[in-house]
Structures are given as structure tokens and as C-alpha cells.
UniProtKB/Swiss-Prot annotation:
Pfam family, one: QueC
Keyword presence, Nucleotide-binding: yes
Cofactor field: Zn(2+)
MF terms in GO: ATP binding; ligase activity, forming carbon-nitrogen bonds; zinc ion binding
Its job: Catalyzes the ATP-dependent conversion of 7-carboxy-7-deazaguanine (CDG) to 7-cyano-7-deazaguanine (preQ(0)).
Name listed for the protein in its UniProt record: 7-cyano-7-deazaguanine synthase
Residues annotated as binding ATP: 9-19
Record-linked Gene3D superfamilies: HUPs
Catalytic reaction equation(s): 7-carboxy-7-deazaguanine + NH4(+) + ATP = 7-cyano-7-deazaguanine + ADP + phosphate + H2O + H(+)
Spans through the membrane: none
Pathway: Purine metabolism; 7-cyano-7-deazaguanine biosynthesis
Length: 241
């Protein structure tokens, strides 16, 4: 009988790849998505589409982080457009205070209710926006805290699986292509428009990943950054098996 695992599923490129990865490793996957008052609610539709594609159970948890505020993802603060070369220089206004700590705590509670000590998250510490709760030392500390603070953790160590942690965005895309991830169903843009903006950190890092992997991103963008548009003709269309 396969072991159960809870996968944090936002509907983005990374979390969708991790869900496919966990399934490929033989886990019985239970997805969990968070409606936290984010402006880019389109990602919730993507997480629904991904969970239906893979036919996995998906739990939606509402945690209104707008009451805490101080993030461009939840407040009326402009989402910045930065040069991709400067993205990791400082923590941007899109950082949501303690978001991963809140989400992982709830995901761990869900996992414990299912009788498992396995949680998967699609965080990455290579091509990322510099969020402090995406670093390896953070996940090590959080894993120890959950092992100490849960009933199941007293019997066996709680595992926060971060399989994409040391992969570049290009490597993540390549892994997803190998796993046949339906990237056309995913959503990464921080803005909740009909088309992805192509300017926010998340869009640029995603496009950089596809470009360096040699594939064209299947999503529609209202604007492409120059580094991507000048290489677009060289990129292969993404075709799933």
C-alpha cells in the first residue's frame, strides 16, 4: 500500500512539478491549496486544474493573510518589475510574512490527520526571489520543529520534502517535461490579469527557466522580457506525450 503524502499545491510551475514528482515516487498524494487573500486568485483555478488532471484529492484552506498585510500579493501595493539580474539582491514587497511557516504548519496538521509524516513543497533556493522561508536552513529548522511538536513526530521524524531546492528553474522545467507535467494549466504570475504580465519576478524566473531548458513557455503573456523574446524563435514548442 503506497504511503500517503501531502503536497502544497499553489498551481504554479514548481508546486505542480513537485506533485508529479511525488506521484512518480509512488506516494498516495493529497494536495492542499491555500486561499489566503492573494490578488492572483487565478492560481487557485490552476491548482484545481492540476489536481483534476492527476486525479488527486485537493483540500482548500482559507487563511486570510490580508489581515496581517504588508505584501504586494495581498495588499494594494504595486507588484514590482525588476531587472532579472537584480532579483536576488533584496527581499521584495511580494514577500508574505511567515507564509511558508503558516502553510507548512497547516499542511503538517493535515498530514498528521491522514496518519503520515510526509509533506512536499516546491520551494527553490537557486532561481528565486530571495524569500527567507525558501532557504535550506529554514526547512531544516521547520522539520525539526514539526518533529518535536506533533504526535506523529514523536514516533518518527517529520519529513519536509523539498526536491527542487537545489535545482535551477531550467532543471525544474526539464524534470517537469520528463514527468509530462501539463505546464499549460499552471499559473505563476503575481498579477491577477487574464494573461501573465511577463514583468514580475515570478514571470521572469519562469520564462528564464523555459528559455534555458530550450522550450517555449505554453502560457500567454501580455509582454515578454527582452532576454526571452530575442531567443523565442530558437525555442521548441512544448508537446506533452
Amino acid at each position: 500500500m503506497p504511503k500517503k503524502a501531502v503536497v502544497l499545491l499553489s498551481g504554479g510551475l514548481d508546486s505542480s512539478t513537485v506533485l508529479a514528482y511525488a506521484l512518480n515516487k509512488g506516494f498516495e498524494v493529497y494536495a492542499i491549496s491555500f486561499d489566503y487573500g492573494q490578488r492572483h486568485l487565478k492560481e487557485m483555478k490552476s491548482s484545481e486544474a492540476i489536481s483534476k488532471f492527476y486525479n488527486v484529492d485537493r483540500k482548500i484552506v482559507k487563511v486570510d493573510l490580508r489581515s496581517i498585510g504588508k505584501s504586494a500579493l495581498t495588499d494594494n501595493i504595486e507588484v514590482p518589475s525588476r531587472d532579472i539580474s537584480t532579483i536576488e539582491e533584496e527581499i521584495p514587497v511580494t514577500y508574505v510574512p511567515a507564509r511558508n511557516t503558516i502553510f507548512l504548519s497547516i499542511a503538517a496538521a493535515y498530514a498528521e490527520s491522514l496518519g503520515t509524516n510526509e509533506v512536499f513543497i516546491g520551494a527553490n533556493a537557486i532561481d528565486y526571489s530571495g524569500y527567507p522561508d525558501c532557504r535550506p536552513e529554514y526547512f531544516n529548522a521547520m522539520e525539526n520543529a514539526l518533529s518535536l511538536g506533533t504526535k506523529i513526530g514523536l514516533k518518527e521524524k517529520f519529513h519536509i520534502n523539498v526536491p527542487l531546492q537545489y535545482l535551477s528553474k531550467a532543471d525544474i522545467v526539464k524534470l517537469g517535461v520528463k514527468l509530462n507535467v501539463p505546464y499549460e494549466l499552471t499559473w505563476s504570475c503575481y498579477k491577477g490579469e487574464e494573461e501573465a504580465c511577463g514583468e514580475c519576478d515570478s514571470c521572469q524566473l519562469r520564462l528564464k527557466g523555459f528559455m534555458e531548458a530550450g522550450f517555449a513557455d505554453p502560457l500567454k503573456y501580455s509582454k515578454y522580457p527582452e532576454f526571452y523574446s530575442k531567443n523565442l524563435v530558437k525555442l521548441r514548442p512544448l508537446k506533452r506525450r
